[in-house]
């Protein structure tokens, strides 16, 4: 995956690095790399998503009280 950042003439290095970091974060490259380090079965992935949703719902109910 390529991340292309255009640099305008006279633009500061700090600004360019900030742009690069934002593009890097938006592309979610780190997240993809971490996910691909080990294989997770689809059923386990689904179970994890459901557990997170259940936890969020529980927290929402506690906040309403």
Curated annotation (Swiss-Prot):
Record Pfam families: Ribosomal_S21 (PF01165)
InterPro entries to which the protein is assigned, alphabetical: Ribosomal_bS21, Ribosomal_bS21_sf
Listed transmembrane segments: none
rRNA-binding recorded as keyword: no
Domain of life: Bacteria
Assigned keywords, A-Z: Ribonucleoprotein, Ribosomal protein
Gene Ontology biological process: translation
GO molecular function: structural constituent of ribosome
Xref: HAMAP family: Ribosomal_bS21
Family: Belongs to the bacterial ribosomal protein bS21 family.
Name of protein: Small ribosomal subunit protein bS21
């Amino acid at each position: 995956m390529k991340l292309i950042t255009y640099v305008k003439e006279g633009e500061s290095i700090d600004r360019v690095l900030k742009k690069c970091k934002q593009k890097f974060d938006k592309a979610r490259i780190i997240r993809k790399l971490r996910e691909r380090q080990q294989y997770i079965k689809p059923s386990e992935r689904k179970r994890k998503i459901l557990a997170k949703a259940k936890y969020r719902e529980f927290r929402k109910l506690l906040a309403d009280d």
